[in-house]
């Protein structure tokens, strides 16, 4: 079971059909795969590269879907709202906002691909288990780790970090 990284993403695009495509993909739990597909097994295109084969954790991204996704997406699983790890999208005019969980880390490589495809991308993320958070806007990542009370106040409030760490501080004071 992974540590879950909480993510908030807002995208814009001049082409309404690109937002339609993103929203449909997100509702179908096939968001990243739609815009940044994982390579297929050359001998069986119905399978992902290395699917079903055992792999070494030190292998490169050319031999397994797992390594490829970590290198290119920034996380190992796709995102969406159908599986229960994301909320329904909110759309107003040319802007779409989603809130979702990803495994271990935010999908920063996916965000980079969206920018290449003409999206304006603004995101924030928080992983309470490893105590890191950040904001990402069109390629600029502001990353913070360590004590959450040293994070920017807007980020602390956005993810209500007091809910995650407040009880720990009370326990520390008792010791």
Please report, for each region that a protein language model flagged, where it lies by residue:
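Long, contiguous binding/interaction regions
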Residues: 1-174
């Amino acid at each position: 079971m992974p540590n879950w990284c909480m993510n908030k993403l807002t995208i814009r695009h001049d082409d309404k059909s690109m937002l339609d495509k993103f929203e449909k993909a997100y509702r179908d739990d096939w968001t990243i795969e739609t815009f940044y597909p994982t390579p297929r097994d050359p001998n069986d295109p119905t399978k992902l590269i290395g699917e079903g084969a055992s792999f070494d954790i030190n292998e490169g991204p050319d031999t397994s879907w797992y390594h490829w996704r970590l290198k290119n997406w920034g996380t190992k699983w796709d995102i969406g709202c159908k599986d229960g790890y994301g909320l329904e999208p909110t759309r107003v005019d040319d802007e779409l906002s989603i809130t979702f969980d990803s495994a271990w880390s935010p999908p920063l490589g996916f965000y980079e691909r969206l920018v290449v495809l003409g999206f304006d991308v603004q995101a924030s993320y928080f992983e309470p288990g490893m105590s890191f958070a950040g904001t990402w806007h069109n390629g600029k990542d502001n990353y913070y780790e360590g004590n959450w009370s040293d994070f920017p106040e807007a980020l602390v409030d956005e993810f209500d970090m007091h809910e995650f760490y407040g009880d720990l501080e009370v326990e520390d004071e008792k010791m």
